[in-house]
Structures are given as C-alpha cells and as structure tokens.
Amino acid sequence: SYPAHGKEVSEILGKADIAMYQAKKQGKNQYKLFDSALEQRVQKAIYIEGKLQQAITLKQFELYFQPKINIRSGQVESLEALIRWPNNGRMIFPDEFIPIAEDKGLIGKITECVLEMACDTLSQWNGLVHLKGLSIAINISGKDISVDNFYEKLERLLSRYKFNPSLLEL
C-alpha cells in the first residue's frame, strides 16, 4: 500500500508480486500480506538460488559427522553425514538450500556431491586402524533413487574409491 510499501508504482507492484508468489506457494485460495520479513526471506531464497549451481560446480559443500552411539556399549557404531554449505563466512544449513535445490531440480547433483565426499572419506579411513570399519550413513531423496542412472553412478564411485561398500549406508 502507498506509501508504506513504496512511493513508486513499480516498487509497490514488485512487493505485491512477492506476496502473491508466497500465497501461491501456500496453496489455492490463499492470500499473503507483504511485510519486510517476507521480503527478506524472498531475497535470501533468490541469493541462495543464484549461488547454488556455483556451489555444486565448485564442490563447496562440507560433510559433518554425527555419531550414532550404541546405548548399551557406549561405542560409536556409525556416523551420519550431514551436509553443510559454508558461504561468505557463514554456514547455510540444509533447511535453507535443500528445498530450493529440490524446486530447481538440483537435488540430484547435491546427492552426487555427498556420495562422492562420503566415498572419499571412507577410502581415507580405510587405512586408519581406529576408524577402519566405521560406516557412514547418508540421507538421500527417493527422487534420487528413482533416477535411471543412480545405481550406475553409485557403482562408479564404489569402484573408484577403495573401501568395503557395506560401510556406506543409504
């Protein structure tokens, strides 16, 4: 509304468009009022979308490992790989970029990055006595498994990196 959301017609229409887009994302028969928080979320999503392809190409993602501990023995049985994206001095967490990657059809490429990083890690651990035999679990989307060449790509990774394939949990 004038003047709260702008003094120029183009500025007001741009903000109305942002609100309309968000209402459409929520489903049919919805409405959304524009506010500055909405604008910040949209700008952040646009920023992430713009940087995501570059992050995939340059392999800017990192894996962090969360231990899975056997309650009875207190021993670490395996690790869960958690993807993180360091960007300009801050961490972009999966809940911020995974939905955008899925929406833009990039989730398969991210899964490939995670698989390769996990395989590389397991290969490096293969020679370390205290880490040998420790498995890594990764979360993958059902969409990834249904892609025709998923298993071929997985087989190529397993043949390239030398480790016991049973140590990779999908």
Residues of each region from the PLM?
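Catalytic strand-loop-helix junctions within cyclic-nucleotide turnover domains
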Residues: 1-12, 37-41, 68-73, 85-89, ...
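Cyclic-dinucleotide signaling modules
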Residues: 1-46, 50
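Conserved long alpha-helical elements within nucleotide-processing catalytic cores of c-di-GMP signaling
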Residues: 17, 21, 95-99, 108
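Active-site catalytic microenvironments for nucleophilic, acid-base chemistry
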Residues: 22, 84, 100, 117, ...
